[in-house]
Amino acid sequence: MEMESAAASTRFHQPHMERKMSAMACEIFNELRLEGKLCDVVIKVNGFEFSAHKNILCSCSSYFRALFTSGWNNTEKKVYNIPGISPDMMKLIIEYAYTRTVPITPDNVEKLLAAADQFNIMGIVRGCCEFLKSELCLDNCIGICKFTDYYYCPELRQKAYMFILHNFEEMVKVSAEFLELSVTELKDIIEKDELNVKQEDAVFEAILKWISHDPQNRKQHISILLPKVRLALMHAEYFMNNVKMNDYVKDSEECKPVIINALKAMYDLNMNGPSNSDFTNPLTRPRLPYAILFAIGGWSGGSPTNAIEAYDARADRWVNVTCEEESPRAYHGAAYLKGYVYIIGGFDSVDYFNSVKRFDPVKKTWHQVAPMHSRRCYVSVTVLGNFIYAMGGFDGYVRLNTAERYEPETNQWTLIAPMHEQRSDASATTLYGKVYICGGFNGNECLFTAEVYNTESNQWTVIAPMRSRRSGIGVIAYGEHVYAVGGFDGANRLRSAEAYSPVANTWRTIPTMFNPRSNFGIEVVDDLLFVVGGFNGFTTTFNVECYDEKTDEWYDAHDMSIYRSALSCCVVPGLANVEEYAARRDNFPGLALRDEVKYSASTSTLPV
């Protein structure tokens, strides 16, 4: 376990003392200790002596309480020899007993945690664990996780283990610790549903890298590790050329039935398509998604809806997670920031909202936060840094060019510079530290203009116009470009899409979607650009498709359960309770019911 020694140290402060004592009392006793007055104990460590007060040491450590008060010990004893600790660590522990602060650095954290554990000083243990959490990286996550085998640090262990699972692909590329895992440790990692890999090829390649580090002693372990790969989810060509024909696999008799079963499962998937029953087969069971795409609210069946569905990209399934107590909302914005989903502005067929609601996806609770300065239906929303930006929209009277941003820490909205044009039904995103907004409707015509906001200068700059007018557009940053997708040009709903290069200040067309749509949700999940629902010119739709910039092609994804437009989407990564938003991997009765309920399509005209 290595950490950058140049990293800044942290002075940990324990706000709640293990034994309550006023700050003034602590300060006075520390002055007495430093002056050598009223001390009633001497702690000896490797020839070094530390004078102290027994009651102060007892206040933070059950070890010292037992040492000074046990029946077999002489309570009048003054000098104690303490083995198994260095003088430097004992000095820090005694200082902590008096001041409740301790400097924690990459150089001392391991020894300090060991010493705090030895003396049962939970304040320092907690401080060291928090420090190690903050230092987790690709190079040290395995070492930190193993370090917790020796000490009771369950939260740190969980954090480190989930870091390994969530960052597996990148960690394998750079971590020397990965190559030193035992076969059991590696097996335990790669069999987990939580392992975050976009393709199972990455798991197989990791196994090969681990074996190649010591092939003579490790090649026989291929029979233990290969069944933990979801082989039937691989592309057939990769499986046949790279797995089935691999020398380690071919030389293992135990791998032959695994290959046969994988081929059969792959054939069944190809012929019949995936079903929930496949989730019980370890060769076809999809991993849990690292990120969940939420599709929130919208316009359905002639009225706004409160429906919320969660998309599990690894299983290609939608899960109904609607909170029935929440009121319906359409033409709103959605944003994820620092653990919360924010629902911003919108319309319920009666009122135009300036209100903002915050959803905690772990606790599943909703709270109202500060309202915007303006009512904003058809609002454009995006996140940059620590702020949520809300731009344009319609307040029930006029289309807006105003913009504002929200800071969760202060729970305040602040106006920023207005845009060059009034824009409702536009869409916004962020790329390279700037906010982009494209298209929309100004009250007279659909727009093909676009502009960019510089947060440092608080200025909007007009950029190259799009190739098509687009209101009800979807805009998203994907790779190195800003994508503008679909929308309404004043006559037709569009299938077309285009990509903007900030470097060249130019737009280029990309392949068209399968279906025309406006007022849909748009997000990027697992390096794919998803478009969700919308209005096709005749009806609302539950159709979903995705674009892969690597292949420059669109693909069909699983339909939502609910036909709707005017919805908003956002992506939530790294949820601790992701299973509650993902397709069920177990075999409980009725597990498919929550995914299969569908609502009638609306053929109503959308509100303008």
UniProtKB/Swiss-Prot annotation:
One of its GO terms (biological process) is homeostasis of number of cells within a tissue. Pfam families: BACK (PF07707), BTB (PF00651), Kelch_1 (PF01344). One of its GO terms (molecular function) is ubiquitin-like ligase-substrate adaptor activity. GO terms for cellular component: Cul3-RING ubiquitin ligase complex; cytoplasm. Disulfide bonds: none annotated. The modification Phosphoserine is found at S501. Kelch repeats lie at residues 292-339, 340-386, 388-433, 434-480, 481-527, 529-574. Self-associates. Interacts with CUL3; indicative for the participation in an E3 ubiquitin ligase complex. It is linked to Spermatogenic failure 11: An infertility disorder caused by spermatogenesis defects. It results in decreased sperm motility, concentration, and multiple sperm structural defects. Oligozoospermia is usually observed in SPGF11 patients. In addition to oligozoospermia, teratozoospermia and moderate asthenozoospermia is observed in some cases. This is Kelch-like protein 10. It comes from Homo sapiens (Human).
